[in-house]
């Protein structure tokens, strides 16, 4: 927890309009109303149990139903069994219920939920509803934007279910609390002259989990850089590093690459 405290105190001392499009976590802000976003996420992770790396691919479609509600569907692919194959999919929804706006800042809060289905074998104690586990999650997220800095934090409850024919091991805890802290700063441009300008954002995110049955936990740090092109295209590049863990995990450190394009006013 000392890592979170240091970074949080550092960020609230900054006084420097930032994007709230984080790489690893979702902010309280929503996708633009009437928009449809298409994203392809990829990760290349070090396999902790075998030689080589683990590759995950996740195509996603996001729909901004209105200014307060968005939904997303995802598919999960992995090279787990010596070849890229479909492992499952998921659905995500987020409802923004609080907005406080000022001249150079705003505050948002939202509730979110996720359901995932996965047919992979269960190899690890950590619960991952975006890659390895079936289950559901519900939580809250708050995001503060101050000038060029965005700070976002979330807390959620997750429960893992059986992965099709692979039953969740009884010796492992299947209930978890997830928590995140994300900080992003707009690095370029220093001053806007056109909405077509490429935005460059630097970010640092902390992602953690505690299994409620046994108290085991982990915390990862994820620095990243993001490019937003013509206000529609987005490229994210991130590196995840485990800070500590008392949980067995199949993959800890690795690289993430996400490509996204947003179509505006599709359903308005």
Positions of the model-derived regions?
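Short glycine/proline- and aromatic-enriched beta-strand/turn motifs that initiate or cap beta-hairpins
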Residues: 19-62, 116-122
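Short loop/turn motifs that connect adjacent beta-strands in outer-membrane beta-barrel proteins
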Residues: 26-33, 68, 83, 99-108, ...
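Residues that define the transmembrane beta-barrel architecture of outer-membrane proteins
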Residues: 32, 53-57, 84-89, 105, ...
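Membrane-embedded beta-strand positions of outer-membrane beta-barrel proteins
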Residues: 38-42, 73, 93, 109-113, ...
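Transmembrane beta-strands of outer-membrane beta-barrel pores
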Residues: 42-46, 75-79, 97, 113-119, ...
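Transmembrane beta-barrel domains of outer membrane proteins
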Residues: 62, 94-96, 139-145, 184-186, ...
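Outer-membrane pore/translocation modules
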Residues: 82-176
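Outer-membrane beta-barrel "beta-signal"
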Residues: 90-93, 181-185, 252-268
């Amino acid at each position: 927890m000392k890592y979170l405290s240091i970074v949080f105190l550092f960020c609230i001392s900054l006084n420097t309009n930032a994007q709230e499009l984080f790489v690893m976590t979702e902010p309280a802000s929503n996708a633009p109303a009437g928009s449809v976003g298409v994203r392809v996420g990829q990760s290349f992770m070090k396999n902790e149990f075998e030689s080589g790396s683990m590759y995950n691919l996740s195509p996603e479609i996001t729909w901004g139903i209105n200014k307060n509600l968005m939904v997303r569907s995802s598919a999960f692919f992995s090279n787990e069994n010596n070849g890229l194959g479909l492992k499952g999919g998921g659905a995500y929804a987020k409802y923004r219920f609080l907005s406080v706006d000022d001249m150079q800042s705003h505050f948002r809060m939202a509730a979110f939920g996720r359901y995932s289905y996965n047919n992979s074998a269960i190899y690890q104690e950590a619960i991952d509803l975006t890659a390895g586990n079936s289950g559901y999650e519900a939580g809250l997220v708050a995001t503060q934007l101050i000038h060029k800095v965005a700070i976002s934090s979330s807390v959620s409850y997750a429960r893992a279910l059986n992965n099709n024919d692979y039953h969740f091991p009884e010796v492992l805890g299947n209930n978890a609390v997830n928590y995140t802290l994300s900080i992003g700063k707009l690095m370029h441009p220093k001053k806007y002259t056109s909405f077509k300008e490429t935005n460059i954002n630097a970010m640092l995110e902390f992602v953690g989990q505690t299994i409620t049955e046994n108290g085991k936990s982990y915390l990862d740090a994820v620095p990243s850089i993001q490019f937003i092109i013509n206000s529609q295209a987005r490229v994210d590049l991130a590196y995840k590093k485990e800070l500590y863990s008392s949980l067995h995990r199949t993959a800890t450190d690795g690289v993430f690459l996400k490509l996204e394009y947003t179509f505006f006013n599709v359903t308005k």
